[in-house]
Amino acid sequence: MSTGPMPAGNEPQAAVPAAPFGQPVPGSVPVAAPVAAAGTAAMAALPTPSGGIPMPMTVAPQIPGVPVLPAQARPGISADPEWFRTAVFYEALLRSFADSDGDGIGDLRGLISRLDYLAWLGVDCVWIPPFYPSPIRDGGYDISDYTAIDPRYGTMEDFRELVHQAHQRGIRIVIDMVVNHTSDAHPWFQASRSDPEGPYGDFYVWADDDSGYDDARIIFVDTEESNWAYDVERGQFYWHRFFSHQPDLNYRNPAVIEAIHDVIRFWARTGVDGFRLDAIPYLTESEGTNCENLPGTHEIIAGIREMLDREFPGTITLAEANQWPDDVVEYFGTEEAPECTMCFHFPVMPRIFYALRQGSAEAIRWVLEKTPDIPAHGQWGTFLRNHDELTLEMVTDAERDQMYAWYAPEERMRANIGIRRRLAPLLDASRSEVELAYALLLSLPGSPCLYYGDEIGMGENIWLEDRDAVRTPMQWDDSPNMGFSTVVDPGALTLPLIQAPGYAHLTVATEMGRPDSLLHFTRRILHLRRSHPVLGRGGFLLRPTSDDAVLAHTRCDDPSAPEGESLLCVANLSATPRSVTIEVPELAGRRTIDLFGGCPFPSIDEHGRLTLTLGARGYYWLSVDRDTPESVENAEGTEHSGDSQSSAPPADTTSTHTAQNRPTERMPDAHRFHLRSQGSTERGVDRAPAAQRPGPVDLAQRHRDPGGPGPVDASAPLVPAQRRRRPGAGLLAHHRLLGTRGGRARPRHSRTAGRQRAR
């Protein structure tokens, strides 16, 4: 660990020029020594602990003469303090996203080079998991230095440039702050174990035996047998809620609280817009409890929020608390004593997947009804997948067994109490199911977070250890290493690329060139959500339906709002078409317009009922009594509502990927998931000519069907997929490319038969 000055930490740096989409930022990234480790104001005056580990106080880097601006007053960023309500978050795993210097490891400048792509996609905020120095025994969540950047990822100048370049594009930056534990390689722990009476001796939870807190559950049941681990050097046990190499900090020690405050101050001075507070339910311990969500923990989080509001106003905090909503809601705090700005809603996620296989909306409806109201200052965070396993901790034993049978029939698909698979393979590469999942994610209460690669339908490598199965390199194009890195030796890559038949088609470049791809669908639905802020700010109310397979809810602005809007969102979780009547009595007599197709739908009758027919896995977003309908295609070019200077496509894609300039190629048989017609059969029959297709107001049969030969009409509205999949045909995981071979449907087979494994 370096004890010297931070390299060039306070020197003005030349701005990195914005690179066109898909091109690396000019200049190489020098590998610098890590900056000095963080101390604290309280610790700085204390003597150096025995063992020769000096820990000087460091100061966050700043450009001389340029003050740190409040989060709501930064160039390129809107001044709206409520920006997070309508934002789309995107988790970019740094080491697997983009490599700028050819060493096989993703880095900060690689992320900078892809900011134009993220702005084009419709991302408002990038969440970056840990990039600090670490032994990388838990994906970087085992931190050995809180105030440095792992030299494999770049330098502090690179990070500051990332924040600047992101803000110039209207994109905010949220970083992970692991406040519960450190790595056992952290100097604090090394000092604590070697000098129990020294200034760091009480930084962790030590005991003479392992009998304490025996009501606390073990989180990583696959690898850990106890929450205590014995340290030979100190001759005592230390407490850890996660891996044994991640000792928990002792928040009963005021110096620990001040040290963590200083770490957060350090990064807030770089201009980041928020912090995801990792694993916060476990900060304190108490005998006779399960050591989760204790009052002392809430005091600690409230203290962090108070410090940020006072010193860095507008900076948000996002709680990662894998708990039931009744417990999580406490992390919002109160209006008088706020805690977190946002909290992830964990239980709704597995129930979306459960509902898709059960063919009923009851599981989703149940968890939403169990979700308590939250304070006015708060907002839920929602997601379908992330860098961890799809947790099944908050489903019943019977539901868990059923989900394992549906989604993880092979043992190696599982991790801890969950499933280590990506979105598209989970859903058997069904375009209609993936679309429906996104339609639910983007219309339910909360701000959605996408996981890198899910927008193109990336697969997983279940042969990798633990959760690395879903952390493989981003697939940008069909060049060597999928455009992720220029390194010659594939063994130098941070993780192996997915190797499966047809995998080269699952790239940003391929899907960018096809207007009917999953990537373009994702972009359009994100921009549609952006053009209707009610989906982020509006009230939410479940609506009674005549069919349990159909979920209906409204998102409504305050009726007194001069430009308020009301949306009715309807989703059919069944694999068969359904006709349903929805009750919305206060909207009786109002007209409805389909936001995806831009066409009028039936008006709600005088009794407040609306009857619709939905195709299999079909969905609608209906604007109620709006004068000017907007289609997805119009929404795609929507301005960034003040948070972006332009939403135009990146320079290298504007002239080559329009329907007018590019004839539609016949899609490869091996890749019909992304490119096949939504109205085609499993035999891969191309679409009928436009004149033979049903009209846009045919509610049961409407399709956009651009998979066959001939030009694609880019002005045609994008319509949700409603094709009924024939049972038993082509049910292979996504990275093995569902589809047809030689124009013939595959025979019926079990869900596990003939699996091609990524190696």
Predicted regions and their residues:
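Regulatory N- and C-terminal appendages and interdomain linkers associated
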Residues: T3-P7, A44, V580, D594-R759
